[in-house]
Amino acid sequence: NVTIPYKKEIMDQLDFISDESRKIGAVNTISLENGKLYGYNTDYYGFGLMLDISKIEVKDKRAVVLGTGGAAKAVVTYLQDKGVKELFVVSRNKMKNNWSGEVNLIDYSDLQSLEGDLLINTTPVGMYPNVGKSPVGENVIKRFEAIVDLIYNPRETELLRLAKLNGKKSCDGLYMLVGQAVKAQEIWQDMNIDNKVTNIIYEELNGEFN
């Protein structure tokens, strides 16, 4: 596995880069296959698993992504690949647009009047130990159908608490964490891992965090 700050730099050393990694511009998993180095981004697959399990639809939806870091790039790439209708990325510096494809870069003041189907937090706001904070207020949350927070500690962030309070469909990032790790094992072992195994790992970690 590869972590920050080497996810981008390592790409020049690889013989093969997967499609999702090339689009994202980062690799987090490397496999040695027949003497060649292959790079993948399993965050992409982990995010997809999380949405599938939570029954959150992407195709033809209007989505807003909070944050512009590495996780945001994986999320944006997945949304684009799965046919999102309209996509907004919220940044504190909307003049710096490094996004490919149809991405609308806006700032937090623009968000106050925006409505959509899916709101995804990729920022660390609300993560342990700085709990009790939300990247957006209820006035924003009320204008979306589903709220996703990639944070998994705490299990219920302030953002998710407010989402549930307003009757919104919501999910945290624990299944993404598990899903990306399982995908890495599938690559290394060259095998498909049954979803039952993924669920067992999830339940084990769920018990640890609760």
Task: Indicate residue ranges for each PLM-predicted region.
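Conserved S-adenosyl-L-methionine
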Residues: D81-E86, L165-K169
